[in-house]
Amino acid sequence: MKLSCMLIEWALYVCPAVLLATQMSLAASLETLKCEGPVSTEHSSCLAATEEDEGDDDMARSGEADFRFKGYTFSKPFHLIVSYDWLILQGPATSIFEGDTLVLHCRAWQDWPLTQVIFYREGSALGPPGSKSEFSIAVARKSDSGHYHCSGIFRSPGPGSQETASPVAITVQELFAAPVLKALPSSGPQEGGSVTLSCETKLSLQRSASRLLFSFYKDGRSLSSRGISSEFRIPEASEEHSGSYWCEAATEDRQISKQSPELEIRVQALQKPATPETPPPAKAPGPLPLLPTPSDEQPVFSFSDPYLTYRINRLLRQMQDVRILLGHLVMELRNLSAHRKPATTKS
């Protein structure tokens, strides 16, 4: 399949591998746009038809850059900006992701030599003045995003005064999201069951071809280091596997690595089947408490009629004797009940 280029007004659709151009160019600079291969240049366009896709009316995207439409393959857009300033800051022409090298160029009118060059981010100088017109960050991070500009003094035949370039917004895109550790089937597995830890993250669509390596940790101790699998399996969980787990996803060159939040796993012990409780053996009955005995004391009732007094007091003494006998009977029944309970439970 042959790649193609198309120039439409200010938007330039190019083949990144063969185009010699910059994101921002000075009006007096000489830039070369080159489109290789058998092409058609009708209507100031640079196109290349694909042999196998001619006549295809549907648009199909492939990869991060090019797409096909009606038999033609196009690269992603390239925006060319022409400036008439004395000094410009030239940023990267393609998207910058975490781990990439970020290179900035401070370019003067007609590439006149500069001195006392300073690069800035968000208005703060990134270093002392120098003669180098290039600034680079070997491993870009998201925190390196911001507005950059540069300043410098022209050597002859320039104006001789310090010039400052307009700010350029630089965005370092996230290569992959911070991972999240998940436990399947749950973070509270039963003892003896299996547990699978999954370190979940996703690469940026434009860098989906990159490969990540995964590591797993428990309580600060490494369980698995830099493997291609995003899962770690515990075949038979026990109480020893309870603890704090986390995972790490990293690029192959280890330039970018991110850790997941900790996940607390508590293995639940197996519950033993409930057994019927055996009642404690009944205590042997102790001696019966002393009960009052019939009293021969004279009753306290007294009437004017001696015979009535005699009959009333005798009746009261008989009632007292009955009460004492009933008390003895109740105690006997309690003792008998205490002896019969264990036999009833066993049966």
Curated annotation (Swiss-Prot):
Region listing for Disordered, in residue ranges: 272-296
Comp. bias intervals (Pro residues): 276-292
Range of residues in the leader sequence: 1-27
Disulfide bridge map: 106-150, 199-247
Organism superkingdom: Eukaryota
One biological process term in Gene Ontology: immune response
Chief location of this protein within or outside the cell: cytoplasm
Name the UniProt record assigns to this protein: Fc receptor-like A
Native source organism of the sequence: Rattus norvegicus (Rat)
Recorded name of the encoding gene: Fcrla
